[in-house]
Amino acid sequence: VVTEVAADTLTNGRTLDAGQTEAAGAIGGTDRLVTVTGPAGTGKTTMLRVARRLLENQGRRMVIVAPTKKAASVAGQETGATASSLHALLHDHGFRWTDTPTGQLWTRLVPGQEDPQTGRIYEGPTRYELDRGDRVVVDEAGMVDLHTANALAAIALDSGAGIAMVGDHLQALPVGHSGAMSLMRSRSSAVVELSAVHRFKDPAWGALSLRIREPGRDAMAVAH
């Protein structure tokens, strides 16, 4: 099924490799928590286009969120999915946070409660409503901190939506408490690792990019 949907979705003769096919199938499947890891250039965006179509064919929706509004906007444009910054989605679902000397303090409003930030009554999510079976895809998930991931998990539990953490845990660390992607990965019922780099025409450059990604394991990557 994934191969057929990919043929209908992708243009210019593009196809998915085995890892992309598995990842698209996992995101378009029924696992509530999915993790897809891989360095830049492994075709995560192309894979997400196909996953979105898989979900749509089932009457389900993909919502892409990212740590920054710009990253979310780019992901939305490239995949055709609804997109938002992760914090905008959390805010829409009632979460509020303030910085304190000991870290961020998170609270959650319930419908009918007054929002202390605006003085208005919070009426529930209005911009990013989620239904059972929808999939929230967290792009650049390696940058998500534990507090934020915990809030998203609560929303998924309440709404019945699934989560897909997509990104490279070795690329960039979050500003807050790190480890969210690793924790989500350990709890995921579907984990896919993308390893084929498509960004470079010369395979040697792709291999080098993978070595640079883990300099601790290959200290000669940069030198050679």
Residue ranges of each PLM-predicted region?
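Conserved ATP-binding/catalytic motifs of P-loop helicase motor domains
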Residues: 1-224
